[in-house]
Amino acid sequence: MWGLKVVLLLPVMSSALYPEEILDTQWELWKKTYRKQYNSKVDEISRRLIWEKNLKHISIHNLEASLGVHTYELAMNHLGDMTSEEVVQKMTGLKVPPSHSRSNDTLYIPDWEGRTPDSIDYRKKGYVTPVKNQGQCGSCWAFSSVGALEGQLKKKTGKLLNLSPQNLVDCVSENDGCGGGYMTNAFQYVQKNRGIDSEDAYPYVGQDENCMYNPTGKAAKCRGYREIPEGNEKALKRAVARVGPVSVAIDASLTSFQFYSKGVYYDENCNSDNLNHAVLAVGYGIQKGKKHWIIKNSWGENWGNKGYILMARNKNNACGIANLASFPKM
């Protein structure tokens, strides 16, 4: 995989500077690596044009990064033949209820006494299950919710267990399954349902099915949820430090996010008012002087840095990361 990334990141400023035979070779290698097949030659040609445009974007960005313009690098991945608009349409899924408003009953009020650690990584504490892949189903909200529940289950019982996002996709009537949803609706469902099944009991299929919840497969409960004060990164930091992994919403609509590879992600075009994707904050820290959040995505391990991204922290609520943050009570 690393060999592929090196090959695909050869500088290319324009197609004219990139011999067609090299592009042909890289295209075939990319298709083989990610097992890409197309329905027709016309479809493949259109997908290759998108891939070439993305490859050029990646190469130019990385040249700029080498000159100090950016704090992060990009790399070609399995989303290479998709536009950023297609990624948002098919692989995000945050849908905030029109009537959503924070209640004093569910507002997280931080305990400001005492210091929080300068960094924390719940992966190292055993609170985080392996990275999953939601596929082309708008179920990011389910994976984000499940991740937060898994962290609290570990904290309460000492056991790390994969919970079922499919259970939420199929059964949370307030959400729209693969058509999108919201995390607090998922937490409320688990509370009212008195449980959520394990992944083993209710496997993920990546499409809407009838609700098949079975109490015999129940692996966790929920007593409610708390929401972080809107846009307050200090409160979010304290929640992550004191509570555990937190469900967050971000703008994932940019090509720079689609092909993120390493470094601290900050794109001034990221719109904090355009929240479209739910992910999981599993920690925070500082890398090369840059404060960041450690974010677990649900696009598989081929995306980002083995499925994760470091997102800028305390940079004016970049990408809206603290606007719709919440966690379950267990």
Curated annotation (Swiss-Prot):
Propiece span(s): 17-115
Keyword Signal: yes
Membrane topology of the entry: Peripheral membrane protein
GO-annotated biological processes: bone resorption; collagen catabolic process; negative regulation of cartilage development; proteolysis involved in protein catabolic process; thyroid hormone generation
Annotated glycosylation sites: N104
Tissue expression from the record: Expressed in the thyroid epithelial cells.
Catalytic activity: Broad proteolytic activity. With small-molecule substrates and inhibitors, the major determinant of specificity is P2, which is preferably Leu, Met > Phe, and not Arg
EC number(s) recorded for this UniProt protein: 3.4.22.38
Entries under InterPro entries matching the protein: Papain-like_cys_pep_sf, Pept_asp_AS, Pept_cys_AS, Pept_his_AS, Peptidase_C1A, Peptidase_C1A_C, Peptidase_C1A_papain-like, Prot_inhib_I29
Residue pairs linked by disulfide bridges in the UniProt entry: C137-C178, C171-C211, C270-C319
Function recorded in the entry: Thiol protease involved in osteoclastic bone resorption and may participate partially in the disorder of bone remodeling. Displays potent endoprotease activity against fibrinogen at acid pH. May play an important role in extracellular matrix degradation. Involved in the release of thyroid hormone thyroxine (T4) by limited proteolysis of TG/thyroglobulin in the thyroid follicle lumen.
Name of protein: Cathepsin K
Classification of source organism: Eukaryota, Metazoa, Chordata, Craniata, Vertebrata
